[in-house]
Amino acid sequence: MKKVILFGLLLSMGVATAFGQKSAVQVFGVPFGSTYEEFLTAFSEKGFTGKTYIYEGGSDVEVSSIYGTFMTYECYIEMRATKLTHTVYKIKISFSVTDKYKDIPGMEQCRAIISRFEEKYGKATLIQKMHGGKVVQDLEESSAAIWHLEDKIDLELFYRGFDDCKVTYGGKEALDGIFQKEVDQYNQQKAQEIQNQLSGSDF
């Protein structure tokens, strides 16, 4: 299993600043260099809700403080804890596009995930993201033109391992399939608890 690196990212006033990996690890309480399964377990045990960025493929953030831009790809997961299922892991993909960095480690993994989505659900539209208070129209204007999958296509990929990019589409379909057993077990357990409470009451 490949290693993953947690990191935080701030893009403000046209300057991209990458927080240190150690600070991100301290915040989330997951040891640096943990495997994918290890930090998923840690997050799940904490009942964590929110977003965390992960790097996969052995490439660190490329930062140019001189020009106030950065250039790299992102693969990140969004995790939320629910009462009816185990923690649900969603993946959304965003990545930078310039000729200079198009072949950095990990870019192929991002492309593979997007390709699988497109094969099943149609073309995934790429749009420009705000940078420094404006939409970057010209890649030569700023190397920090970040592209991401358009939100309205509702791309939520339940993820089954970065090693081979196994992907299934998220949403109700996945909840009804992958997690239905857990949902049923939870519902049965709660129903029994309620029944026990009622049988022991005066009502």
Where are the language model's segments positioned?
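Sec-dependent N-terminal signal peptides
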Residues: 4-14, 18
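Sterically constrained small-residue positions within well-ordered secondary structures
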Residues: 11, 70, 82-84, 136-138, ...
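Intrinsic disorder/low-complexity segments
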Residues: 17-19, 82, 125
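Non-cytosolic coordination micro-motifs
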Residues: 21-60, 95-203
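Mid-chain, structured segments of secreted extracytoplasmic proteins
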Residues: 62-111
